[in-house]
Amino acid sequence: MASQSSQADQQQQQQQQSSQSQQPNAWEKAERKFANKNASEYYDPCQDFADRSLKCMKRNAFDKEMCGDYFQAYRDCKKQWLTQKKFS
């Protein structure tokens, strides 16, 4: 009787392993999705300029006039990036 239960346990483990190998886990799905996406969907090359703009705003009590150069640098970067994307 013990051999029957151990055989049943082994069969159950094999079924679980085969079903796990057939279905990729969530991490593998996400990894594949990320790898197949365009760079623009996850990466903004102008994010550094955006971060600097926000830091300037915080430093200057959210006075937009004090951070105009940062905003312009971000707009220029974004414009250049979108133009480059359009032609590639």
Curated annotation (Swiss-Prot):
Domain of life: Eukaryota
Extent of motif Cx9C motif 1: 46-56
Location of the motif Cx9C motif 2: 67-77
Signal peptide: none
InterPro entries cross-referenced by the UniProt entry: COX23, Cys_alpha_HP_mot_SF
Family matches, as SUPFAM superfamilies: Cysteine alpha-hairpin motif
Any single biological process term in GO: mitochondrial respiratory chain complex assembly
UniProtKB keywords: Disulfide bond, Mitochondrion, Transit peptide
SS bond list: C46-C77, C56-C67
Keyword check for Transit peptide: yes
Primary location group: mitochondrion
Keyword Ribosomal protein in record: no
GO cellular component: mitochondrial intermembrane space
Biased composition annotated in UniProt, kind: Low complexity: 1-23
CHCH domain span: 43-85
Compartments it resides in: Mitochondrion intermembrane space
Region called Disordered, residue ranges: 1-31
Record-stated family: Belongs to the COX23 family.
Function recorded in the entry: Required for the assembly of cytochrome c oxidase.
Record's protein name: Cytochrome c oxidase-assembly factor cox23, mitochondrial
